[in-house]
């Protein structure tokens, strides 16, 4: 039966899902999974300053709402208050790079949240050019 659900962000633990080394600086992506079901997922996301993610899409619609800091997606700067709608099958149009203060955002998915990379080899070449090393994470 349909119901209303209330959840507070403080009731969820951060899960570190991506770690990069930018020189000697450790840079992370951390998530709080607020809701997960086959038809919807809601995630509170934190990117440390400089976090760099590959261009990718998802096998569902994906909505981002920027709360704090800034993120650049391809050439588009996304400040607080920006909503980004990535339709099922589309890609972001470039790498995703967190601004100098990092970024906090809410992500909504309407199905599968698995990233679909556009060009993994090009992404790794870009990381090498920038001196960024991916670090394996077990979560």
Segments from the language model and where they lie:
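A short, N-terminal "cap"/entry segment at the start of jelly-roll beta-barrel domains
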Residues: 1-39, 121-126, 132-139
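Conserved short histidine dyad/triad with adjacent acidic residue
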Residues: 26-30, 37-57, 88-91
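Short strand-coil-strand connectors
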Residues: 37, 72-74, 99
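Short glycine/proline-enriched turns and hinge-like loops at secondary-structure junctions
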Residues: 57-59, 76-78, 97-99
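Glycine- and acidic-residue-biased ligand/ion/polar-headgroup-sensing regions
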Residues: 58-73
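Short acidic-glycine-tyrosine-enriched beta hairpin
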Residues: 73-93
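Double-stranded beta-helix
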Residues: 93, 99-139
């Amino acid at each position: 039966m349909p119901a209303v659900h209330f959840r507070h962000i403080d009731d969820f633990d951060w899960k570190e899902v991506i770690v990069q080394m930018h020189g000697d600086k450790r840079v992370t992506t951390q998530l709080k999974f607020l809701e997960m079901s086959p038809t919807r997922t809601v995630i509170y996301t934190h990117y440390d300053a400089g976090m760099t993610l590959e261009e990718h899409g998802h096998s569902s619609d994906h909505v981002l709402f920027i709360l704090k800091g800034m993120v650049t997606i391809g050439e588009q700067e996304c400040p607080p208050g920006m909503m980004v709608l990535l339709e099922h099958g589309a890609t972001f149009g470039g790498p995703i790079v967190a601004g100098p203060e990092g970024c906090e955002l809410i992500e909504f998915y309407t199905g599968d949240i698995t990233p679909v990379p556009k060009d993994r080899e090009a992404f790794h070449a870009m990381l090498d050019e920038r001196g960024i090393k991916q670090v394996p994470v077990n979560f």
